Amino acid sequence: MSSAHVLSDWLSYSIAGFSALCVQAHLTSRFTPAFSRNLSEKLPEHNRAVFWWAGMSTRALRYVFVVINITITALLLSEELRSFGLKFSLVLLGVGFYSDMKLGESPVPHMILCSVVGAAILVR
């Protein structure tokens, strides 16, 4: 196994860990109160900006994000599905970046995550 492949794997594990942290933050504020509060405050705005066509409640969208983050975590932890998981993550981060731009928020968090995912794809 080349060192580039090992780097891609470690970046994937890091992204999977962050995705699992997002699941926790969506479900409870016990371990990450500030992150959880930020997600709950911004979710209604993102719902109106990007997901208006779906007609979902903010609560339903929260659970959609939980399922998406669990899926990303599972894909990135699976050796066979990791390549697909990275590409899937990049597409979804693009949606998050678009939402940030539409709402006039700082795109830095999504840009950093896109860079990490892009690096993992590039060295794979």
UniProtKB/Swiss-Prot annotation:
Q: In which pathway does it act?
A: Mycotoxin biosynthesis
Residues of this chain annotated as glycosylated in UniProt: N38
GO molecular-function annotation terms? isomerase activity
Annotated localization: Membrane
What are the UniProt keywords, alphabetically? Glycoprotein, Isomerase, Membrane, Signal, Transmembrane, Transmembrane helix, Virulence
Coarse class of the primary localization is membrane
GO CC aspect terms = membrane
> How is it placed in the membrane, per its record?
Multi-pass membrane protein
Q: What is its EC number?
A: 5.-.-.-
- Signal peptide stretch: 1-27
- Its transmembrane ranges are 64-86, 106-123
Q: Which family does it belong to?
A: Belongs to the pydZ family.
Give the protein's function: Cyclic ether formation enzyme; part of the gene cluster that mediates the biosynthesis of pyrrocidines, fungal natural products containing a macrocyclic para-cyclophane connected to a decahydrofluorene ring system that show potent antibiotic activities toward Gram-negative bacteria. Within the pathway, pydZ functions synergistically with pydB, pydE and pydX to form the cyclophane.
Q: What is the designated name of this protein?
A: Cyclic ether formation enzyme pydZ
